[in-house]
């Protein structure tokens, strides 16, 4: 009989949910994926499957809406590859066109590990909580059933977080 991953057990026990006296409990969050910026999704997916057995990858060109980048309307398109890797997903991201937070990352670091994806059950509240801590939304958008926002916490944690909330498509 297999057990739930440790992070899932901890979330069920309330670990990771902060509570201050007189304040409502924070929303539930858990790591869902690791995002990697790549030059070519198909090639990166092939190599990961061939070299270390992660895959198969599902390749998508999501149709995003209400895009923002640096607080302004955004116009960009990406191709992504998704595969299970144990309890989390690997998300490969290839820029097809437009200006994104991935561009500045590539200019500074080259291709590679970019962000931690964090699933939340209330993205609006999660974003408000992060903004109250001084973090800002760098890029955001949605598609049917999913809303997402990238927050830069690079100076404080060395990481970029992608908060996302998945709802049943209406």
Where do the model's predicted regions map?
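Short, structured motif recognition centered on aromatic/hydrophobic residues
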Residues: 31-38, 48, 80, 85, ...
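Helix N-cap motif at beta-to-alpha junctions
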Residues: 38-42, 120-123
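Short, solvent-exposed interaction modules
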Residues: 106-128, 132
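The feature marks the first
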Residues: 21, 31-33, 39, 53-54
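Onset of an N-terminal alpha helix
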Residues: 27-28, 41
